[in-house]
Amino acid sequence: MKNQLLQKQAHTYDAAAFKRPPMFFRPGTLFPILCEDDLCGLTEKFNDLKAKGIGRVAPWLIPASRYAKYTGSTLGIDYDTPEYWQALKTIQAAAEASGLSVIMHDESGWPSGQAGGKILEQGGNDWIRHTLQPTASNPINAEPLEKGSINPDTPQPDLLNPDVGSAVVELVLNKHKEQLGGSLPECMPWVYADEPTFGGIGHDPIKEFIWTEGLEQRFAERYGYRIEPFLPELTDPSQETLSLETAQARVDYFNLLAELFEKNYLKPIFEWCERNNVASGGHLLLEHDPRRFMEGGYGHLLRSFRHFHIPGIDSIFQESHPHKRSHHFPKYASSIARQTGRLCSSMPFGASSCAVTPAIFKWTIDHELVRGINLFLPWGYSPNDDIHYQWSRPVFGHFGPLWKYMDVAYLYTARLSYLLSCGTPECRTALYFDMRSIWAGEPWQNKAIEAQEAIAQTLLNTQHDFDFVDDLALKEASFSSDGELVVGKMSYDTLIIPPTDWMEPAAQEVVQRFIAAGGTVLSDSTPDTPLLRTTSPQPMLRVCKRNCLGESIYFLVNEGNDPIDTTALFAETKLPEQLVAESGECLPTYAEQQNGTVHMPLSLAPWESRIVRFTEAATSSPKISQSTQQQLDKWTSKIVEQTVIQEDKITTLTPEDNDFEASALTDWCESIGNDFTGTVRYQTRFNLTADERQQSWTIDLGDVKSACSVSLNGVLLGRKLWAPFSFKLPGEALAESNVLEVDVSNTLSNLFTSTEYLSQVDSIYSEEGARYVRILETWEKETRPSGLFGPVQLIRAT
């Protein structure tokens, strides 16, 4: 059986597949198991997940013996015990019965590379990470680093040691193969690595100078000189600027660590997966910030990503957020995925709190999709309603008021994952990834990072797509017949190289050949070849494009907090149609052809996105103007559900004999209270004459926090999780006297910032868990405002 994760995806767009996306493209979800109860009722839980649009589950057994302090786990099942394997088999059977695929974590906990502690049980101190601790008699004396890379209480194996890499293959991959049996592409199609590192959070690459056995000899063999004379200066944190010779030694040292990590850890896992028809995937540590690349402990980011069939990222602690930054970092992974013809994944929302409103969910997914991500494994699902296991949020689960809406969010994600995997990406610009300057230290490091950040931001702000290329990509590049730089599956006519002193000579030679072949090389400027043009500058408009056998698909995203109102100019000969990811619909759209360019009015609300497909079948629709007929101001409301904590369980209560009362359209925190989490039903009435009932009408709710369900005269109009909160009114549902009802549900932020809950945090969670909760509390308080804010307008199309 072929593993679909290892196959190239379809080249053509199919309307039926967009409407009902294949299970392959549906998002997965982490399935944390922190207690034995989480293993109960799996079939029911998996059926519910599938009904919500989930296609994969990633079971994550986290034993109390290693992680109680950090997660509150009470799970008495350790890795590589009969109970552990039985639990995985039970999960697999339930997933198969529900039609879900299983992603297998390569670690019971995190970070990867420990085999649940079995690695160090086998190798002892010799296999622990070591740091250089020179003595008077031994300048290369190395001592075990007793603290862990993420969990300080647990030492980390030395992932530069070839024996450790071999042991991981044996104690993790072969163990899973032996215990799970069957066809690996069926029972274990995707092995997920979570933050393997030879560094770690808080690791100072100078103060904690990583060393592995025989490194000095490998260094001499690799570079032809000894590192020992340079060590005093290399390991001195007070040395702000190094001599050129010492900086070269520093570059060579970090390059050697990168090579050892690739050769001794990543490559054996990748090759095992190749032999066994399994996709290797996952993400590294701190890949979102170039200033922390060396702390992340993965050597060279792009080179390491090449050793994943599905390179990926995660975005935790609001690293991607509309009120913080619109950064390019997903492109580190997606560049390698494009160049190798592979898929690219993301694990968003970890430890980002219940402040992940539906609108922020969409913004984050859009942010990563438009940068090349096309498979998702979001954090947040909790199989357990016990409050003790909700320390790392967001929380999506059957007990939350938004769960009944999540199929809209997950299917939105799936449709775009499918759509943006069709065909090939349109990308003609490559940006040099200068890892060697980062390794060199100051003054080169900061200059390289600032240049990369500035150029990448300018490219995004001017609607250019781009990929990163590094020294290895340049050295292995070829040239097309018309002189383009060919890197794997991608071809580039423009190469941007910020000023650098550290590009490898062999890469420099390729650049010169590219120039001789007619290629464009820029240093501190960007090309003027955007994917589309606009009649006014739009620095917060992001665009990507897919070419699908003569058709073009554009994904346009307003990442800003202000509306966009412009005209988009496309270099296309066909007319566009609009694809709607929320519903799978295809709608005609107004556009004009002028002098070989398609002009399309483009109005996007903050965080709104648009899919435009250019195809022979498309026809331009007439311009539709709208006039506001009336504003609906007289409202009543009542509570229909309330989510509370009872006996340490998150529970939903349904009030009895609850009558409608007059209500203003305002934050219900002011009327019901800050702590209220649940659903409120709003009701209003309006009249239409017989002539008016023959018109086309839309109801626009204005501002809603956070999600809503709308019905007219008992007929469900639909559900929305983000703006625009507008609904077409079907003619058959209209009456002379009409009753409009709007159910609004909010996030769990209000529950988790309630006075009662916060007063118990220190007794509910471990010290580390409580620390996390205090971080999340600040963000959750920012998203307390809830309800129907309006203005609600009844709009007639003319």
Annotate each language-model stretch with its function.
Residues 717-727:
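Aromatic-rich membrane-interfacial microdomains
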Residues 568, 686-713, 721, 740-744:
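Aromatic-lined ligand-binding clefts that engage carbohydrates, nucleic acids, or primary amines
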Residues 618-619, 745-754:
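Short acidic/polar inter-strand loop motif in beta-rich domains
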